Amino acid sequence: MINLFPEAIPEGGMTSGFLNRAPGLRLLATIGTGPIRGLWTHQTAGNDAYVVSGNKFYKIDTSYNATLLGTVSGTGPVSIADSGTQIFLACNPDAYVYTESTNTFVKVTDPDFAGAATVCYIDGYFAFNQPNSQIIWVTELLDGTAINPLAFGAAESSPDQVVAVVANNREVWVFGQGTTEVWYDAATTPFPLAPIQGAYNEIGCLAPFSIAKLDNSIFWLGSDPRGYGIVYRNQGY
């Protein structure tokens, strides 16, 4: 069944269902040379979209015109978050920040930056996980380019490594290879995040970029010590 999806027919029909065609697609623009590594729509300001195509970062306006903003490293998927004024790109391990008001695009070169695999935004901070570790960092308040060397914490409830962080309902879900923790903004310094007591389960994430938010829930491709390949949706913690 390629490009088809099943539709149920109400009781009384000649058959119980049929295969409906998927909506058609219209080519709007070709951005860069590809592959497309990340897409983002601004959360609070303007109607522009942003895309990482190959090693280039573009802004796309409402007429689908693309403006080159800069160059990024790596070849894999790019995790993106924005604060309303800055857009943070985690390219694993490098990271970049675009400031819309000044139209500046810079690589994060703070000497205390240890690399970013995925990123999210909560309460004025960009939070990101250090690659191949249990460590979560936050940037300085309202500045994605600056890092305090003490602004980090570790997901230590289990020995698995953190693979992704996702902000949901003003909480940060910390996905490990086989477990998941939920943290909140405890307003502590220099690292403001802390685990919520009891918000822990023994299901991790197999694929960081399978994580999606929909209907106030998080969906992801799960993994635990017994196996992997099940799609989960959270209900509470």
Regions found by a protein language model. Give the residues of each.
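Surface loop/turn motifs at the tips and blade-to-blade linkers of beta-strand repeat domains
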Residues: 28-34, 69-74, 108-113, 153-157, ...
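A short alpha->loop->secondary-structure connector
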Residues: 100-112, 144-149, 189-196
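Short glycine/acidic-enriched loop and turn motifs that connect beta-strands
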Residues: 94, 133-134, 225-228
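Beta-sheet-dominated scaffold domains
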Residues: 86-88, 119, 161-237
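N-terminal beta-propeller domains
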Residues: 1-66, 116-188
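WD40 beta-propeller blade core
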Residues: 58, 96-97, 181, 232
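A broadly used, surface-exposed interaction patch
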Residues: 60-89
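Hydrophobic or amphipathic alpha-helical targeting/insertion segments
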Residues: 79-111, 127-128
